[in-house]
Each structure stands twice: as C-alpha cells, then as structure tokens.
A protein has these predicted regions:
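Charge-rich, low-complexity intrinsically disordered segments
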Residues: 241, 248-254, 259, 363-380
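Dual-mode signal for accessory low-complexity, basic/Gly-rich regions
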Residues: 269-334, 353
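Internal helix-turn-beta structural module
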Residues: 308-379
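A structural signal for short secondary-structure junctions
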Residues: 235-236, 251-254, 261-262, 286-290, ...
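Short, glycine-/Ser/Thr-/acidic-enriched flexible segments
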Residues: 33-34, 98-100, 144, 204, ...
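Short aromatic-centered micro-motifs
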Residues: 199, 261, 353
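Active-site bordering "gate/hinge" segments
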Residues: 1-240, 368-380
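Oxyanion-binding "anion nests"
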Residues: 225-270
Length: 380
C-alpha cells in the first residue's frame, strides 16, 4: 500500500531543497533496496515537474567487498566517470538509507577510512559546484528496519519519528521550512556579532572564539530533516573541557561518553567509556584531525531522542555539537582534515551558554526570540 508520507517527503525535497525546474537533470542515489520507497516517488514527482531524472543505485555489500579485498590502488580510486557526470547534472539527492547499519563493523578501520578519504575528491567537487551555484544537492533518509533497530524503535514508530522531524505532515511543509529559515537566519545573524561563546554543562566548561566567522542557518536546503545554526570556530580559539554524553557513531563503530580537553584549538587529552582506542586513532588520522572544524546549536525540537544517525542526532533540539577535523571554508574555517567527526553535547537539563559573558541559553533553549531581519525575511 502506497504511503503518502513518502510522496510528501519527495515533494519537499524537490520543491524546497532542490527547487527543481523543468528541463533540469536530477540524479537520485542510494542503496537500492533500502532507498526504494523514496526513490520511486522522487522519480515520479521529478518527471511530473518536467525534469530528467535518473538513478544511481548501489547494491548492499559491494562497498564491503572493495574494503575487504581491494588493493590500495583500488581503495584510492575515484571514478572519472562520476566526476564528469557531476559536472553535467543540475541537482542530486542522496538517500542515506541502509538495510544493515553494521556492515563495516568488522572490517579494517584504516582501509575503510582510506576509501572514504579518496571519495572526498567527489565531495569537494560537489561542494565547489554548490558554492558556485551550478549544482543543488540534498541528503535525506528513507526509514529502514536496520535504522529503526539502531534507534530502539519499531519500523512503524521510526517512520513516524522521521516524518514528524521532516514536518511532511504539516499543511504546507515548504512554508514551514521557509519560516524556520527566517528564524534561524536571524539567529545566525545575531551570533555573527559574538566574539566568544562559553559552554557550561556536566563535566563541561569550554570557551570557543567565533569572532569574524560566519554562522549559517540550516533549514532544509541540503538536509531533510534540518534545524541547526553552525560555524567554524577560530582554529586556535577553543579551550577547556567538554563531555559528549551521546555515543558518536563513525564508520559503523561507536565512541561512548567521550571527554576531551582542548588547548588552543587542539585536543590534548581524550578518553571514552567505550571506543577510546578508536577515538585516539581518529585523532591521529592527519594533522587537522585533532582540531575543531565546527560548533553548532541543534534546534529541531521534533528530534527529541538519540537514534545513532547523525542526520537526526546533530539536530536534537537543545543540544550542541562539535566536529573534530574538517572545517567549512565558506564560513571562514581553515582547519583541513579527512576527518569530520560530529560529537553531541546534551545541554537540555543543566546546560548554559554565554555569549561574550551574557547568558543566552539555558536548559536547551535560547532565552529570547530573534526577530527576522530584512535579510532573514528574504529566505525563500
């Protein structure tokens, strides 16, 4: 039986995220079996809009064969066909759905990281085309049994959670995300005038210099669901201690209850209840891996629980997250790394955030609303 929520999600991605027009070329990519419930309505709705849609679907297990059996040369290979293809398409949507979320757990971590590092060439090319306005991209998810199990939910409950977080059941989902954009853009502008943030919580007292950096509002253009404001901090301006109460899931492995000490923007001490050796290995991946590439506020309050999926977890309303490794060049970030490890700090119970010494956030909420500026009101 056809579920209208998948149709609504497809329409939101095409009309709000990608702003797809007649005559444009759209690539739909994902794991064939896992992504199929969303691939079909995306293709159907793209055709209705007069676009030229095609699919690039992977079979479960193929990447594992490459990581397990491939030579170093094969792990480093980036398809020139895919790179040329990227230059020829107007828009793409990636469906991050997996039938088995633990398929890489027992494979060699260094080999998997090597393969992912090579694929960054494709990601960088896509990022540059997005920045130039030549390409539009969005990442989203079609719920699977495996991802529901990770979230400790039944598939039906997980579907409800996902579609609620995406607001596809609202009377006008596109208008909802436009309004979110106005609010978050106003918040980003406000944070743009801040020199230093101080984050205080359980086992956490961290100062983050953000002076001169641009804050970005995330409201459904490149992720669905969305709901965060983020920036790249000054590379030498992060100092103190921070505890991440939620597990970090990276390449199928977990790091549980990580605690970091940072000095002048670098991790100088790290421990974790689970996965400590793995965390330390990631910090040594390259020169930039122990630096901070991102600091962000999670502001989607429909996402109210941890699900072991970073698309949702980094946006949990009332949290902040920090990413080790690669920063955002467009926002002023200068840290370079093959790593981008998101770590989530839960501030919903006792957390406080100070902006230049003034308390602006308590227990997962900003203390005052922002009023959309003329710039924010132009979010469309």
């Amino acid at each position: 039986m056809r579920d209208p929520r998948y149709d609504a999600l497809a329409e939101l991605v095409l009309d709000h995220s990608l702003r797809l027009q007649a005559g444009e070329v759209l690539r739909i990519e994902g794991e064939a079996a896992a992504a199929a419930p969303l691939v079909v309505p995306l293709h159907r709705e793209a055709i209705k809009r007069g676009a030229h849609a095609y699919t690039a679907l992977d079979l479960s297990g193929l990447k594992e064969i490459l990581v397990a059996q491939g030579s170093d040369e094969q792990l480093d290979f980036v398809s020139p066909i895919e790179l040329r293809e990227l230059d020829a398409i107007d828009a793409s949507v990636t469906i991050w759905s997996e039938t088995n979320t633990r398929s890489f757990t027992r494979l060699d971590t260094d080999r998997r990281q090597r393969q992912l590092t090579a694929q960054r060439q494709f990601a960088i090319r896509r990022r540059d085309r997005i920045a130039s306005g030549e390409h539009r991209w969005c990442g989203t998810l079609s719920p699977t049994e495996g991802q529901a199990q990770d979230a400790d939910m039944s598939l039906a409950d997980y579907e409800d959670f996902v579609f609620r977080a995406c607001h596809v059941l609202d009377d006008d989902p596109v208008d909802h995300w436009r309004q979110v954009g106005e609010r978050l853009q106003a918040r980003a502008e406000e944070l743009g005038s801040v020199r230093e943030l101080r984050i205080v919580g359980e086992d956490t007292d961290l100062t983050v210099v953000v002076e001169g950096r641009t804050w970005r509002a995330a409201y459904g253009r490149q992720n669905v669901p969305d709901g965060e404001v983020y920036t790249s901090p000054v590379e030498t301006g992060v100092n103190g201690t921070i505890r991440f109460g939620f597990p970090a899931v990276f390449v199928g492995r977990e790091i549980d209850d990580a605690r970091l000490v940072l000095e002048n923007g670098r991790v100088v001490a790290a421990e974790a209840v689970g996965g400590e050796d793995y965390l330390r290995s990631l910090l040594e991946l390259d020169e930039g891996a122990s630096g901070v590439g991102e600091i962000a506020f999670g502001l989607n309050y429909e996402i109210d629980r941890f699900t072991r999926n970073i698309l949702f977890d980094e946006k949990i309303g009332g949290t902040m997250h920090m990413a080790l490794g690669m920063g955002f060049e467009a926002l002023g970030g200068q840290n370079r790394s093959a790593l981008h490890l998101d770590l989530i700090c839960d501030l919903r119970r006792e957390g406080e955030v100070y902006a230049d010494g003034e308390l602006v956030w308590r227990s997962g909420q900003f203390l005052h609303e922002t009023r959309p500026s003329e710039l924010a009101a132009r979010v469309r």
